[in-house]
Amino acid sequence: MTSRKQWTHDLTCQPGLIAIAATVLLAFSSAAHGAGEPRETAIRPFQVHVADAALADLRRRLAATQWPDKELVTDRSQGVQLATMKALVRYWQTEYDWRRAEARLNALPQFVTTIDGLDIHFIHVKSRQPNALPMILTHGWPGSIVELLAIIDPLANPTAHGGRAEDAFDVVIPSLPGYGFSGKPTIPGWNPDRVARAWDELMKRLGYSRYVAQGGDVGAAVTDAMARQAPAGLVGVHFNFLINFPPDVLAAAFGGGRVPAGLSEAERAALAAVTAAFRRGYLVEQGEHPQTIGYPLTDSPVGLAAWMLDHDADSYEKISHAFVDGQPAGDLTRERIVDNITLYWLTNSATSAARMYWESSRARADAVARPPVAVSIPVAFTVFPGEIYQAPRAWAEKVYPNLIYFHEADKGGHFAAWEQPELFASELRAAFRPLRGAQ
């Protein structure tokens, strides 16, 4: 008989203002741990319910928005356009219902467990198929667990989505430290390497002795770290974003080195795109001064939304079309976009999430000076056409010598799992198929 205790956990919405009353069901999970398991390693069921006062405060802030003048150009060269933001805020204030997001989350098996002194929130959906392959998927910024929700059923229940029963996965989706309902680090050091070790501990704690991992954006950095650490049980990884580069490319893009000789036209284009991407304003500011940008993002929901939208050109165009023209890209709908922004707002996680870039910038500087440990485990990679930069196969092969799968998809962008969940799931099935049954 599993012992249960229900209590209310307060997540601060705004410092000194309104607290979110998140109803959390705490219990020792009989599936993974016995009733006598210490609380430090216990897996506690979790559900969320935001206080009405927090939602009222959000609506009040939206209504009190002080708008800037319209941009002076007809494109997005000056940043997020006023028409896009006004359409988003109009929807957010008058049509959007956070309770629908809560219901969607609470319909899934959610849990919290303490790893390395920090509470880690995660979704864990087990397939009905007996030989399902366990997989841990890591989101990025400005995403969250919201960007991965639509791929859960195609992965866990492939036969309902045109797949085969033998392609099923047990799905584990944690919230990164400092994001969403996970705890916020109180000391420096929660870089991708540390998160990678925590993720392996999570999979072991769930009883998995053999599993795979997937990541894009910040999640790619974590998954890359897992691949380099190569813990016992991790048999392969998949990326949809190249986070590490051949040494000569790394030196040219980040260390001021010369452009490597002999690059193909595609590689030259990729190098230019990589160099430009890592000089974008959000990445530089969050990498250097996350605390500074945290003040306006914590005080203004509209400021937070604009900052999150100004991520990459392809995603911005799709989001703008969703609000201005009513033409969403796949599951990247108005509701899902605002679900994601509202999750950041209600959990007051803009600053703590941005600190991951501060941590990663130091790791990247180390990589320029000292090449990281090579990856020997099997690696799969999918390139999506709307991604910030197109990873050349030659680079992926140099960084990951044991590349077992490389495919260029015909649609999808930086948030590929969000935009094209069925396609993304089919890529993961194909990528990991060679590893099923291999002991």
Predicted regions and their residues:
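Conserved alpha/beta-hydrolase
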Residues: L155-F181
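Short beta-strand element of the alpha/beta-hydrolase
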Residues: A132-G140
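Glycine-rich "HGGG/HGxG" loop immediately N-terminal to the catalytic nucleophile
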Residues: W98-R100, V146, G163, L176-W190, ...
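Conserved acidic catalytic loop of the alpha/beta-hydrolase fold
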Residues: D193-Y211
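Non-catalytic accessory segments flanking enzyme active sites
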Residues: L55-K126, N131, R336, W345-N348, ...
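Conserved hydrolase catalytic core segment
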Residues: P154, P158-A160, S209-V259
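C-terminal subdomain of alpha/beta-hydrolase-fold enzymes, centered on the catalytic histidine
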Residues: Q286-Q439
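Bacterial N-terminal signal peptides
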Residues: G16-F28
